[in-house]
Regions:
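Short Lys/Arg-enriched alpha/beta "domain-start" segment
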Residues: 1-43, 64-72
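Intrinsically disordered, low-complexity regulatory segments enriched in Ser/Thr/Pro
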Residues: 42-65
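Non-catalytic propeptide/linker segments at domain boundaries
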Residues: 61-87
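Acidic (Asp/Glu) carboxylate-rich active-site/surface patches
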Residues: 27-32, 48, 78-87
C-alpha cells in the first residue's frame, strides 16, 4: 500500500524506472518519497496522498527533469524522457 496518491505514485515510479534514475522508494507520513540518482546528481520527488508533488534537490539536470515530470503530470501530458547532459 502506498502513502502517496495511487495514480500519481504509479506515474512517477514508472517515469523514474523507465529512465533508469530510480534509486530508492520510501513510504513516509502522508507521502511516497522517491530518490532519483544519475551519476553525481541526486534528487527527491515526493507524492502526497492529496496528489501534491514536491521536487527537492540542488539545481541540476535531474531536478530540472523532475520538475518537468511534475508539470507534465499536472497538465495531463506525456512525461518527457530524461536527457542526460553531454560532457
Amino acid at each position: 500500500m502506498t502513502n502517496g496518491h495511487p495514480r500519481i505514485t504509479h506515474l512517477v515510479q514508472n517515469a523514474l524506472e523507465s529512465n533508469g534514475v530510480l534509486d530508492d522508494t520510501n513510504e513516509i507520513q502522508y507521502a511516497t518519497k522517491f530518490t532519483a540518482q544519475f551519476e553525481s546528481f541526486r534528487a527527491h520527488i515526493l507524492v502526497y496522498n492529496t496528489g501534491k508533488i514536491v521536487v527537492q534537490g540542488r539545481l541540476s539536470p535531474l531536478v530540472t527533469w523532475l520538475q518537468h515530470v511534475n508539470t507534465s503530470i499536472k497538465a495531463g501530458r506525456s512525461i518527457p524522457a530524461f536527457e542526460p547532459p553531454i560532457d
